[in-house]
Amino acid sequence: MASNFQDDEREQAMRMLFDLYKDESEGRSGVDAYLDLDGMTIPFELKTTSRGSVTTVRDFGPDHIEKWRDRHWLIGFFMQGREYYKYGSPAMMAPWIAEKGKYIEPDFSLAQLAPPKLNLQDMYNILGEKERYTYEDARYIQKRQYSKATYLARQDLDAGYSPQRMLEIVRDRTAYLIKRGSTLNNPHIPLSYFKNWAEITENHALILRQMVKAYLENE
């Protein structure tokens, strides 16, 4: 927990140092920072490290690949008594993101291919054969993955579910479990990945804008 507070403090310091801002309406899960440049709003991922490698996210999956496709990165290094920063354009981060995406791709393909192959007999083997399944039956399968409103909305019988609808719920659960097991737990970006990136040690806001502008002009 203390580490999280320290990261938050460093990220806030980075926003001030580089003249960036956060859209507070997006909440904690929103974009880390934005940069306004020549009428454009540039989204940034902010990271800090004191150990060399850079941590990313708890459950890395296809949604992060899509989210980071056009994201710019700003990384603060606090190591061996030095403090410096490095900027990474979307193109500079693309190889690492693509490598991780390739690693999880077959697992997420399974999450799409496997659930439709489950049939009514498979569902009967889990819940028994019934003409109508209850809210409790559905919750036994999907647990907290559905809200109560979703459970009720999915009922296609009076206060219950038909066998076909319950099969759909079992398939949903199967897809969720495969996807959950397919995400990467906080993949680290090694220090060597940033070896040839330029350090920013002064005139932080100005230099960052120059680097972003140069990237956009050559994109």
Residue ranges and their predicted role:
Residues M1-I42, T48-E219:
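Nucleic-acid endonuclease domains
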